Amino acid sequence: MHFSGVVLILLSMTLVNFVFVETKVETGQYVKCKYDICAKSCQEEKGKRTGFCSNPECICSKD
């Protein structure tokens, strides 16, 4: 019983963290640009090599 409680807590923390990161990426134009989130967003979602911050927006590389 104790083990399932620990697993439940870890699972809920992971889900909250995932939702929070996705929210920051989606609302990037309203908050200060974060380099690591910008680069990850460009690589995974847009297929670009990298991205850089030109506050307040994230700009992906051309290639």
Curated annotation (Swiss-Prot):
The keyword Secreted applies. GO terms for cellular component: extracellular region. It is found in: Secreted. It comes from Tityus costatus. Keywords: Disulfide bond, Secreted, Signal. Residues 1-23 form the signal peptide. It comes from the Eukaryota. This is Cysteine-rich peptide clone 2.
